[in-house]
C-alpha cells in the first residue's frame, strides 16, 4: 500500500498538474466572469469540513514538493496560484492585476544588500518578482468600508541542512498556518450572508525578505487605503503558546488600540502579546499598514519555539486541533466587525 508520505506527495503533484495550465496564463486562472459584485456560491463550512480543509491546505502548502515556498521563487508562485484558484472556486471577486486574483510585484534589481545577505545561504535562484493573491467579498450596506484579512505566502525555501540533513524550510507554522486561516475564513464568509462591509482577503509574497508584497499592496491597493476599517494579519497560529490559555490567541500591539478588547467582547479568545520584548507588532506585515494609519494588528500563538526559521518547522509539528479551533474562534468576531458600524481607533500614542 502507498505510504502516507507518498499519498501527500501524489496529492501535491495532482494539484500542481491541475493549476499548471493556469500558471502559463494568469488570466485563465480567474477568467473574466468574476466581477466586484460576484455572488459567492459556496456554503459555510461545518466543523468537520473546516477541519478537513485546514488539513488539506496545510498538507499542500507545507509539503516538501513546495520546497519551503522561498520568497520570490517558483514555489512561492505556485502557492499564490493555489490561493488564487481557491478564491475563484469560492466565487469571490478578483483584487489583483487586470481582473485577476494575482498582483505581480517586481523586486528591485539589484536586490538591497540586506536582502542579499539574508538569502546568501539559501537556494541560488533568480529572485526578480513576487506575487500577492487577493480576493474581494463586496459588502451590502457599506461596501466602501473594508475589513482586511491577511497572511504571508512565503517562507525561507531551501537552505543549510540541519543535523538530520533536512534542507527544506517548510514553514508549516510560519506561515502556512496563517495562509490556511485566511483561506478558511474566505470560505466561511463566502458561504454566509453577505456582510454589511466589504472583506478583502490578501496573501502577501516575500514577507521574509523585506515585505515586498505588502509594499506593493500599499502602493497599488485594490481598495482605497482610507476605506480600510481594520486589518488582522494571521501569523504562526499552528501551535499553542503555553504562556496563554490553550484555547487562546494573542494580538500584537494589544494596548495600542481599542481593537483587541472590542473583538474579545464579541467572542474572540484574544489576549495581549505575552512576549513584548520581541517587538512582534513591528515584525509582521501589519506594521506597514499601521504606519499608514490603518488599525492593523497580528493574531498569533507563536511560543518562541525552536523550530522557528528551521527545517523542523514541519507539518508533523502542527497542533491541528489548536489551529482549527483558532480559526473557528475568529469567525464570529470578524463577522460582527464586518456587519458593525463601529470603527476601531488608536489609543493615545498607539499609532506608530
Predicted regions and their residues:
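Metal-dependent peptidase/peptidase-like ectodomains
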Residues: 142, 194, 204-298, 302-307, ...
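N-terminal hydrophobic or amphipathic helices/low-complexity stretches enriched
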Residues: 29-94, 137-138, 143, 347
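Bacterial N-terminal signal peptides
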Residues: 11-25
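A non-catalytic alpha/beta surface segment that caps or lines the substrate-entry region
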Residues: 69-137
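Alpha-helical metal-binding/catalytic segments enriched in His/Glu/Asp
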Residues: 133-135, 149-210, 330
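Acidic/His- and Gly-rich active-site-bordering loop/insert found
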Residues: 61, 87, 123-161
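Second-shell loop/turn segments in exported
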Residues: 40-48, 64-74, 119-124, 163-175, ...
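His/Asp/Glu-rich mid-to-C-terminal helical/loop segments that flank catalytic regions of hydrolases
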Residues: 191, 306-352
